[in-house]
């Protein structure tokens, strides 16, 4: 069975990957504030091992405000107000999953620990500048991550929200995996079909059909 060490280890030796890291280090060395902090950039892989992945949620690039990003798509650190897209995710969960209570925080580690890979397609960003690292080469890396999951795992659920994620996931084998698409949960597009998509219950139904333990989407309502 593949591990992230195998997948990421292979990529780490590639010139394009070295170039990504050089660009990020150069930006940090120049005094720019880069999110997430260096020790959190690969958090998604630390918290959800390759053979434990059940659901993949693709984000775009990290939040670019102070103390928000910590390496998991859509998640923010404890003590930070949940951003608008995450609030819409919570609204959909409340509508979709019986008894779901909207938490007061946006810390999604509990999902990651159950097998939800919260993967941004670009892993770093400069403070206050959305998409500032979009051309660093991260997309190549995350394409290869998705390709490895597609090839070496079966019966995963991919939740692709918005055109960017859908384009990114276009080569996923629909015969081996469940691919669910909807507009992005951003306030600009959530009302066009994200709200009411029922992706969370559909994901659990698919896992159940394949005798895989479902995700408990409920988070602690507040962190102690």
UniProtKB/Swiss-Prot annotation:
Localization in the cell: Cytoplasm
Keyword terms of this UniProt record: Cytoplasm, DNA damage, DNA repair, Hydrolase
InterPro entries (UniProt xref): UDG_fam1, Ura-DNA_Glyclase_AS, Uracil-DNA_glycosylase-like, Uracil-DNA_glycosylase-like_sf
Residues annotated as the enzyme's active site: 61
One Pfam family in the UniProt entry: UDG
Highest rank taxon of the organism: Bacteria
Enzyme class: hydrolase
Reactions mediated catalytically: Hydrolyzes single-stranded DNA or mismatched double-stranded DNA and polynucleotides, releasing free uracil
CDD domains: UDG-F1-like
Recorded coiled-coil stretches: none
GO annotation, biological process: base-excision repair, AP site formation via deaminated base removal
Protein name stated in the entry: Uracil-DNA glycosylase
Organism whose genome encodes this protein: Mannheimia succiniciproducens (strain KCTC 0769BP / MBEL55E)
């Amino acid at each position: 069975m593949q591990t992230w060490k195998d997948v990421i280890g292979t990529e780490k030796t590639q010139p394009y990957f070295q170039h990504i890291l050089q660009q990020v280090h150069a930006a940090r060395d120049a005094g720019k504030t880069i999110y997430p902090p260096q020790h959190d950039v690969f958090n998604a892989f630390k918290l959800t091992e390759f053979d434990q992945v059940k659901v993949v949620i693709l984000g775009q690039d990290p939040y670019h405000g102070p103390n928000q990003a910590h390496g998991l798509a859509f998640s923010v650190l404890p003590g930070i107000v949940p951003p608008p897209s995450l609030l819409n995710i919570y609204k959909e969960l409340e509508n979709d999953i019986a008894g779901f209570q909207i938490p007061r925080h946006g810390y999604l580690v509990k999902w990651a620990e159950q097998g939800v890979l919260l993967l941004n397609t670009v892993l770093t960003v400069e403070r206050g500048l959305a998409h500032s690292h979009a051309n660093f080469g991260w997309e190549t890396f995350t394409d290869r991550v998705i390709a490895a999951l597609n090839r070496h795992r079966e019966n995963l659920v991919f939740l692709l929200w918005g055109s960017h994620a859908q384009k990114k996931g276009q080569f996923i084998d629909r015969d081996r995996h469940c691919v669910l698409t909807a507009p992005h949960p951003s306030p600009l597009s959530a009302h066009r079909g994200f709200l009411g998509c029922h992706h969370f219950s559909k994901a659990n139904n698919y896992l159940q059909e394949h005798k895989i333990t479902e995700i408990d989407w409920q988070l602690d309502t507040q962190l102690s």
